[in-house]
């Protein structure tokens, strides 16, 4: 997929330069601009002895008595509010900016020129009377009228400005959450976290708010009516998302300052439509940087916080949904406004309008094809479409606001997106494109070994890489796999693949066509993800199964080698497999555990044929005793032979009793780390049972580390 990423980056760079001189976002609610526009607005209701061929000309800019009246209006309003001449002088720039649309005559005026014009006009100024027409002299407007116009313009502009402020707060909210996560993450390396986890309030928060799943599902997908499927967040992710949704809802619905006199707009409904359109449009754009950052693989917040990539993808999805909702509200509200304002026919011909409609259609298609059913069955098509439509969405949004404001949100998103892609290219280039050895193990497992760079590249337990198999049929695809540093040969990596649909099936076919052993060049990007800091806990329980073995096995090897030095009391690796064929792929790593201080328990979950009356079943219940390595022996079923034998390993038939395993290690002295990676249902059960244990063992510091990731 790297060629798509590169082309996408180039496309975005070209598109971003397609329009010249984008308008910078300015804050309209500043006093000089509000007063200038308010006074220009109130004087615009006056009939002057003035005519112009320009339909949109402004007497306040081109007719001297009107300009003198505007200066006096601003000056008096500032005096009433207690501002000095220095603030008055700041309005001169606002006058020049507003009048630049109508005339260039004011652009060279100095402060002295404006003061002279004000003083000259003050000499002849007359109080305005309602109904006066064809005025040829400067006028003084009633103070209450001026204040009403100021209130009206202030509400209009402040609503627009506060949308940017609220957008910034949403960004700051997620950054703040990640800073808090970073603090908790780095506390894992200190004794303070152990003491913190024993506090009653903290235990209740972790039991009910941060560790458990929602309705027993997180790694395993939910389904409603067999159409709506997807992944639920964990409760901690849910709390973060809920906080964001509350913020977003409040920011979208609260704080509108409506004008009871309808001085700018003809009716209250016009005000509501325009205010909601502006607020929702700005909030939609404020999501750009976060959406780009959370989807990227080189997210600096992930590095500092230890939060998993799968969590950021969960946030990315919710941000995208709310951005789409904002865009729909923006489009509907602005359409309503144009109808109320009787400007529909002219508005729909505007360039910004047409690109806005295009952007809304594109993001709607993106959201629709991001549904779980498309990602599950057509992932490569989804990914390609997501990137292409994403680039088009950037472009249409750019053109939508290029002459308005809000372009800085897109600048930030493009910068984040481009930097991420450049770093990814650097990562792949640094690793090179080595030739890997592929070996078929059993019927559906491939063991891949490949040389890695000697310097500045080392995979920690639980980390993963994105691999592209450089075969002409599927070289563009990039898929994540957990990686192991080889224990057989220094400087090599080991990746275990299990045949599924897609590229792994094609790779297996290629290996089979070459007699079960083959070589192929790879592009490897990584390593990504953080390694769970389990070495800081007294006892470690590693639970794994299915295709989730690499991370826990790597942890077990590392812990086993350092347990004597770090004072580990107990390290237990529990592997649940459906048949023992998968163990052959990990035989070198599992044999390494024989000489380490690690208890290895293997559960075969494959069903055994029912026994007949003629079968003799001998169940030997052995007393718990330890062999030379301290491994506890368990009940065994003699009719279930083990095709692979590892010294000191305890084999079981059936599924592991997660609750029992957790309580066994929970009774040991010292802190406990529980690490899990395996089948989705198994992972969800371990998560929920660990949450229960946190409350049941008040004197014990227990931490749960989940290395299962799916997006």
Curated annotation (Swiss-Prot):
EC number: 1.16.1.9
Binding site for NADP(+): 526-529, 677-678
Cofactor list: FAD; heme
GO terms (BP aspect): copper ion import; intracellular iron ion homeostasis; iron ion transport; siderophore transport
InterPro entries: FAD-bd_8, FAD-bd_FR_type, Fe3_Rdtase_TM_dom, Fe_red_NAD-bd_6, Ferric/Cupric_Reductase, FNR_nucleotide-bd, Riboflavin_synthase-like_b-brl
Protein name (Swiss-Prot/TrEMBL): Ferric reductase transmembrane component 3
Signal peptide limits: 1-20
Residues that bind heme 1: 316, 386
Cytoplasmic-facing ranges: 188-237, 302-321, 375-376, 420-711
Annotated ranges, domain FAD-binding FR-type: 415-534
Membrane topology according to the record: Multi-pass membrane protein
UniProt binding sites for heme 2: 330, 400
Glycosylation positions in this chain: 85, 108, 120, 134
Family: Belongs to the ferric reductase (FRE) family.
Organism domain of life: Eukaryota
Induction, per UniProt: By iron deprivation.
